[in-house]
């Protein structure tokens, strides 16, 4: 009898998932599943401390980055980051050489090499400061759009942002550089971060993604017209 009851329960469960004409009506949340398939970021909602400015900016930056890479299928270029890492690596090399040389040739014999390494290290730090200030600026993403025909160079899309300390105004700038003409165009918005986060500090992509898409589409339309 227990087996029959179990079988009946299973049959009832299956029957509850089948509607008229044998169509499946299981409540699997198909609408939400479709949304999750489209936006991977929604698999793990971004939740931060709303009073932590760095966390707020980083979460908005990362989410904007995901929109360009996942929705528009652009390919990230790591050239800017590689440049910074190269400078840092060279700086660390001078520091390591100074450490090893001083171990092998105790001071004051190591004095000339130590002086050279120290000077070189600070020169590289100066170069790094110039690089981050004038080359990287506030850019956190460089992405390439491949030409479908393979005839023209890649179009370049750049994302940069700013959020001043103790300010709730977040600015996101999207820059488009034509691979064919090298012309550059920009679009940006400045919004209160309260528009994009709920009371618990969770990023609301339904409010944030359309703003990014509007920026992108405004530049994409200009590109097609020209």
Swiss-Prot record:
Bilayer-spanning residue ranges: 87-107, 112-132
Cytoplasmic side: 2-86, 133-226
Modified residues (N6-acetyllysine): 169, 191
Membrane topology: Multi-pass membrane protein
Keyword set includes Acetylation: yes
InterPro entries linked to this entry: Spc2/SPCS2
GO BP term, pick one: protein targeting to ER
Database matches in Pfam families: SPC25
One GO CC annotation: signal peptidase complex
Disulfide-bond pairs as recorded: none
Signal peptide: none
The keyword Endoplasmic reticulum is annotated on this UniProt entry: yes
Main location, first listed in the record: endoplasmic reticulum
Function noted in UniProt: Component of the signal peptidase complex (SPC) which catalyzes the cleavage of N-terminal signal sequences from nascent proteins as they are translocated into the lumen of the endoplasmic reticulum. Enhances the enzymatic activity of SPC and facilitates the interactions between different components of the translocation site.
Subunit structure: Component of the signal peptidase complex paralog A (SPC-A) composed of a catalytic subunit SEC11A and three accessory subunits SPCS1, SPCS2 and SPCS3. Component of the signal peptidase complex paralog C (SPC-C) composed of a catalytic subunit SEC11C and three accessory subunits SPCS1, SPCS2 and SPCS3. Within the complex, interacts with SEC11A or SEC11C and SPCS1. The complex induces a local thinning of the ER membrane which is used to measure the length of the signal peptide (SP) h-region of protein substrates.
Full protein name: Signal peptidase complex subunit 2
Organism: Pongo abelii (Sumatran orangutan)
Gene, per the UniProt record: SPCS2
């Amino acid at each position: 009898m227990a087996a029959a009851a179990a079988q009946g329960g299973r049959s009832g469960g299956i029957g509850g998932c089948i509607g008229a004409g044998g169509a499946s009506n299981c409540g699997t949340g198909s609408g939400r599943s479709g949304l999750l398939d489209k936006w991977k970021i929604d698999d793990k909602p971004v939740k931060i401390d709303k009073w932590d400015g760095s966390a707020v900016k980083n979460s908005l930056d990362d989410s904007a980055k995901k929109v360009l890479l996942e929705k528009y299928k652009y390919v990230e270029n790591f050239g800017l980051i590689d440049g910074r890492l190269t400078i840092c690596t060279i700086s660390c090399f001078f520091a390591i050489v100074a450490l090893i040389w001083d171990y092998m040739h105790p001071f004051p014999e190591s004095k000339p090499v130590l002086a050279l390494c120290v000077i070189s290290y600070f020169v590289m730090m100066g170069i790094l400061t110039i690089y981050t200030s004038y080359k990287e600026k506030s850019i956190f993403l460089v992405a390439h759009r491949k030409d479908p025909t393979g005839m023209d160079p890649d179009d370049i899309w750049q994302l940069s942002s700013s959020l001043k300390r103790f300010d709730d105004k977040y600015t996101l700038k999207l820059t488009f550089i034509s691979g064919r003409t090298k012309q550059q165009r920009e679009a940006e918005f400045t919004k209160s971060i309260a528009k994009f986060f709920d009371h618990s500090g969770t990023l609301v992509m339904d409010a944030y993604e359309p703003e990014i898409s509007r920026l992108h589409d405004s530049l994409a339309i200009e590109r097609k017209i020209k």
